Amino acid sequence: MIEMEFGKELLVYMTFLVVVTPVFVQAIKKTELVPSKWLPTVSILIGAILGALATFLDGSGSLATMIWAGALAGAGGTGLFEQFTNRSKKYGEDDK
């Protein structure tokens, strides 16, 4: 088995989490269980949880490192989603 450098594997996991976290957040948004203003916080929490779950994958870092990486990926995923959907202009319309 070829060993990768820790930093490269962490970037792979974070990239995956940046893509997956907004999918989970959108599913939660559709249920309307969480007000829109809390979705960025939910995204960070989901990223942290997914990061913790990724601890069990080969080549992952410590639990604390993976939770931190997941939380950063959740924050990044929210930022990317906001950028692509341009919600910043209509944010007030989404609040319930």
Curated annotation (Swiss-Prot):
GO terms for cellular component: host cell plasma membrane; membrane. The chain crosses the membrane at residues 33-55, 61-81. GO terms for biological process: killing of cells of another organism. InterPro entries: Phage_A118_holin/antiholin. It is found in: Host cell inner membrane. Residues 1-32, 82-96 are cytoplasmic. It is a multi-pass membrane protein. Residues 56-60 are periplasmic. The keyword Transmembrane applies. Isoform Antiholin: Counteracts the aggregation of the holin molecules and thus of pore formation. Isoform Holin has 3 transmembrane regions whereas isoform Antiholin lacks the first transmembrane region. This is Putative antiholin. It comes from Listeria phage A118 (Bacteriophage A118). The lineage of its organism: Viruses, Duplodnaviria, Heunggongvirae, Uroviricota, Caudoviricetes.
